[in-house]
């Protein structure tokens, strides 16, 4: 009898395989074979490789939700803790994470790019919630735009950060949050 697999098991195994093949070289048939399941069983859980990348980013979101933000005394500290936990969740596979994004950005993958924009928007909304940011009206719009820029800038820098424990990215995050505060957007 074949044991059913869940998406998280697939993500774990896909990451292991992609360590050898690169993300682009990862084949769903090879993933199924490595788990001793047939492709039909795999297709019940994921219908395309990008769903595995999305599940990987879902893990980062979950890590962010599970972070104890009570240690943050204000919105800026909570924001920093939330973003750090999101990045830390991806850190074990930083290079593969970058490869996943390259895959999404290929010219023929416009549908994946649109979904990626929605994911960024969703993550930014959660960051606002978790940090307790409560601006409304035009202040909220400015806050969301600035937070989107902060998040994507830090994330893109993190993708290429080779410093020990991504210390360069953490410095960039602190500087970006300081700018966010100076603009009066951290309320």
Predicted regions and their residues:
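N-terminal intrinsically disordered/low-complexity leader segments
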Residues: 1-5
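Hydrophobic alpha-helical connector segments
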Residues: 68-96
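Secondary-structure edge/capping motif, primarily at the C-terminal ends of alpha-helices
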Residues: 67-71, 100-104, 158-162
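Hydrophobic/aromatic-rich alpha-helical bundle segments in the mid-to-C-terminal region
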Residues: 133-179, 184-187
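Short, basic, alpha-helical segments at the C-terminal edge of helix-turn-helix-like DNA-binding modules
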Residues: 57-64
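Helix-turn-helix
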Residues: 9, 13, 17-55
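Amphipathic alpha-helical packing segments from all-alpha helical-bundle domains
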Residues: 109-133, 141-152
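Amphipathic alpha-helical segments used for helix-helix packing
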Residues: 90-110, 121-124, 128
């Amino acid at each position: 009898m074949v044991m059913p697999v869940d998406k998280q098991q697939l993500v774990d195994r896909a990451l292991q395989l992609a360590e050898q093949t690169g993300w682009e070289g990862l084949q769903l048939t090879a993933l199924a074979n490595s788990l001793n399941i047939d492709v039909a069983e795999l297709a019940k859980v994921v219908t395309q490789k990008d769903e595995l990348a999305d599940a990987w980013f879902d893990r980062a979101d979950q890590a962010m939700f599970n972070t104890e933000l009570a240690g943050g005394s204000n919105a800026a500290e909570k924001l920093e803790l939330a973003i750090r936990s999101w990045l830390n969740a991806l850190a074990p596979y930083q290079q593969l994470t970058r490869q996943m994004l390259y895959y999404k950005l290929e010219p023929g993958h416009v549908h994946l790019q649109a979904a990626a924009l929605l994911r960024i928007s969703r993550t930014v909304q959660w960051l606002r919630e978790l940090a307790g940011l409560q601006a409304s009206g035009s202040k909220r719009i400015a806050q969301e735009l600035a937070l989107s820029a902060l998040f994507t800038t830090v994330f893109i820098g993190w993708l290429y950060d080779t410093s020990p424990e991504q210390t360069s990215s953490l410095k960039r995050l602190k500087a970006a949050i300081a700018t966010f505060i100076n603009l009066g957007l951290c309320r």
